[in-house]
Amino acid sequence: MAASSPSLLLPLGSASRNGLTTKNPNSSRYIAARVIASETREQSCKISNLSSRREAMLLVLGVSGGLSMSSLAAYAAGLPPEDKPRLCEAECEKELENVPMVTTESGLQYKDIKVGRGPSPPVGFQVAANYVAMVPSGQIFDSSLEKGLPYLFRVGSGQVIKGLDEGILSMKAGGKRRLYIPGPLAFPKGLVSAPGRPRVAPNSPVIFDVSLEFIPGLDSEEE
């Protein structure tokens, strides 16, 4: 269990308290971000309502391993991998075959499914992104789409795995990208398996499809 490695997602409750500062509190993007944070705080309150010790242990293991609560709910429901929502469906996969691969100095590789518009997020800025995380075989081990809400974190600040951090830093709002993350930039201690979720071996490569929905701070400045 990768308890000492960077968590996959930053808890939105703490993010909204410390980082969602904007010049326009009535901005639609700002309000949306506050709703996202509120939803996550409500999810955390469900810990006290778990019906059994086994459910409580499952939740604790999932959170410490960097998994979203929504993912655990989907796995517990026995949702088959092929029925899980994806950012890149069959037609997208075919088109991706003709997209050139970009390789960075760190070894990260990526293909742009869709190039966004505007500036890339500066280091330390809040970003709202959807993602689908997979092992090389294509099996999903975590996904924000299963809850239907994007996640917020400070990009470039070590709040997510290194490959995801680096991959998003050069994206633009509205963009969508597939990241081929090598082991050293992924999960050094791996992730344990769970019902409906494959094991991620230590220092093994993973694939992330990422959609950068918006950048709250830049959005408020533009308005």
Curated annotation (Swiss-Prot):
Q: Which residues form the PPIase FKBP-type domain?
A: 124-216
Q: Name one GO molecular function term.
A: peptidyl-prolyl cis-trans isomerase activity
Annotated transit peptide: 1-36, 37-76
Instruction: Cite the entry's keywords alphabetically.
Output: Chloroplast, Isomerase, Plastid, Rotamase, Thylakoid, Transit peptide
Where mainly located? Answer: plastid
Q: What is its EC number?
A: 5.2.1.8
What is the similarity comment for this entry?
Answer: Belongs to the FKBP-type PPIase family.
Protein's name according to its UniProt entry? Peptidyl-prolyl cis-trans isomerase FKBP16-3, chloroplastic
* Protein species of origin: Arabidopsis thaliana
The gene name on file is FKBP16-3
